[in-house]
């Protein structure tokens, strides 16, 4: 497996599993959050499969991803209510990109957090970008034990606590089959206190 997400960009939108994951995530999101008219940050947007779906119901979306190639593919979709930022999310990038200097009603992260070097620290930074009563929703591969690929329920719970979010949901949301293995996907939904 490559270390660079740029290497996956060209065929990403054609991958049936990636398409299915985005659709299942969107379906569960709209059951939990009324997205109509919301200002959204899609953190780790990739080529924007989830962003595209959100753009049909949300007001404005800022989509951020450190993969320049993936961000370029999303930009080429010319979604009128989407601003694309090709960068890592850091305090410095927030100061650098005017699109990130506002508060969001909803922040989503689809199959992102298990790849972060410091998930709790990143979630705390993301929480600072939410409006009071704003929603955080993430989907990540479920790890059965610490050290396995993905995130454990306990590590997600701990990150929600550290970031100050009130937990609304933390459960297996759906499963995906890869070869002979079924992999569960957690959904975590938190709300920033008023």
PLM feature spans:
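Conserved beta-strand signature within the Rossmann-like core of class I S-adenosyl-L-methionine
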Residues: 133-141
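Short alpha-helix
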Residues: 149-164
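A short SAM/SAH-binding and catalytic strip from SAM-dependent methyltransferases
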Residues: 105-119
